[in-house]
Amino acid sequence: MPPKARSGARRTGRRVVKKNVAQGHAYIKSTFNNTIVSITDPNGAVISWASSGHVGFKGSRKSTPFAAQMAAENAARKAMDHGMKKVDVFVKGPGSGRETAIRSLQAAGLEVSSISDVTPQPHNGCRPPKRRRV
């Protein structure tokens, strides 16, 4: 049986390494239920990320534009701590937080150099969900 850890023993977590990256990519995935913002360096290594749920919203409030705004601000703040100044934005998905997230990235102090929509388009792939009857 392995020895039991002492109560009061320190836990060694992963230390955050400060990278100095001036330019990168911001990926905004906005679904009907949530918005996820990931900011990466030009090679694709994630520097910071945030989502509506991670920021503290639960349930149907995660899909609101305000929740997307808070998530984008949070991710931008963390990226700017690593020296990020300029981003290319890639937006994916049909959600309501798309434009709000882009605006809040700009408001947080990141310079948005380009915006492109990378929403995947099916060539008649999966059957879509049935119509809602309210």
From Swiss-Prot:
Pfam families the UniProt entry points to: Ribosomal_S11
Gene Ontology, cellular component aspect: ribonucleoprotein complex; ribosome
Keyword set, alphabetical order: Ribonucleoprotein, Ribosomal protein, RNA-binding, rRNA-binding
GO molecular function: rRNA binding; structural constituent of ribosome
Region (Disordered): 114-134
Superkingdom as given in the UniProt entry: Bacteria
Annotated GO biological process: translation
Keyword Metal-binding: no
SUPFAM superfamilies: Translational machinery components (SSF53137)
PROSITE patterns recorded: RIBOSOMAL_S11
Subunit structure and binding partners: Part of the 30S ribosomal subunit. Interacts with proteins S7 and S18. Binds to IF-3.
Recorded family membership: Belongs to the universal ribosomal protein uS11 family.
Function text: Located on the platform of the 30S subunit, it bridges several disparate RNA helices of the 16S rRNA. Forms part of the Shine-Dalgarno cleft in the 70S ribosome.
Entries under NCBIfam families matching the protein: PRK05309.1, uS11_bact
Protein name: Small ribosomal subunit protein uS11
Protein's organism: Corynebacterium efficiens (strain DSM 44549 / YS-314 / AJ 12310 / JCM 11189 / NBRC 100395)
Native organism taxonomy: Bacteria, Bacillati, Actinomycetota, Actinomycetes, Mycobacteriales
